[in-house]
Amino acid sequence: MGKYPNDGRIRVQLVAVVANIAAPTVAELNAGTHITGFLSKDGLTTPADQNNVDVGTLAETFNAQVPGTFGGAVEMTGLKDDVADTLWNLITYDLGRYVVVRRGPPTATAYAAAQPVEVYPARFHEPVPDQTGGDEVSRFTISAPVYSQPNLKAIVAA
């Protein structure tokens, strides 16, 4: 697959049970809740904290560093809905779920074996309504701290 836009090519699923985060099964993923349609276009941020460790010495003029810790939270911007409000009602304080992100295939494409996905073990904060503004839809912010190392190169199993 060549280069592709994000629009219409990301799928976000909240999954209750994943036995192996390196190889979530099609059945596990399909048992989850597909939330992509409840997120704003800019509404998904995956953990990007990358810390470095200084290893330079006083004898050197170069500030040497090596990789250190990494992590963070999955941050999402949800869209309020005056009918079902599915995502708002789903997210509760301390809810544990796997946030599964698939990039590339069209959003509506069913999960299939051999697809690459990212799997983030997360616990959610209470969703918080965003500040109001004119000519905007009603939004809310979701923070889901990732509590153990995610698998960014998982492959869907049959």
Across the structure, where does each feature detected by a protein language model lie?
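Short intrinsically disordered coil segments
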Residues: 90-95, 139-141, 156-158
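Structured, beta-strand-rich domain cores
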Residues: 60-108
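Viral virion structural and adsorption modules
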Residues: 1-3, 149-158
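Polar, enzyme-active/binding microenvironments
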Residues: 17-26, 30, 106-116, 156
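Short beta-strand and beta-hairpin "edge-sheet" elements
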Residues: 103-154
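Solvent-exposed edge beta-strands and adjacent loop segments
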Residues: 1-77, 121-138
